[in-house]
């Protein structure tokens, strides 16, 4: 349930 901005303006979400 943690989301953050990743590479190349993508969004990375983890539990």
From Swiss-Prot:
Q: What domain of life is recorded for the organism?
A: Eukaryota
Q: Where does it reside?
A: Secreted
The primary location reported for this protein is secreted
Q: Which UniProt keywords apply?
A: Acetylcholine receptor inhibiting toxin, Ion channel impairing toxin, Neurotoxin, Postsynaptic neurotoxin, Secreted, Toxin
* Tissue specificity: Expressed by the venom gland.
One cellular component term (GO) for this entry is: extracellular region
Annotated GO molecular function terms are: acetylcholine receptor inhibitor activity; ion channel regulator activity; toxin activity
Q: Where are the transmembrane segments?
A: none
Q: What does this protein do?
A: Binds with high affinity to muscular (alpha-1/CHRNA1) and neuronal (alpha-7/CHRNA7) nicotinic acetylcholine receptor (nAChR) and hinders acetylcholine binding to the receptor, thereby impairing neuromuscular and neuronal transmission.
The similarity annotation says:
Belongs to the three-finger toxin family. Short-chain subfamily. Type III alpha-neurotoxin sub-subfamily.
Query: Could you tell me what this protein is called?
Result: Short neurotoxin N2
- Which classification does the entry list for the species? Eukaryota, Metazoa, Chordata, Craniata, Vertebrata
């Amino acid at each position: 349930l943690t989301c953050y901005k990743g590479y190349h303006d993508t969004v990375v979400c983890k539990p």
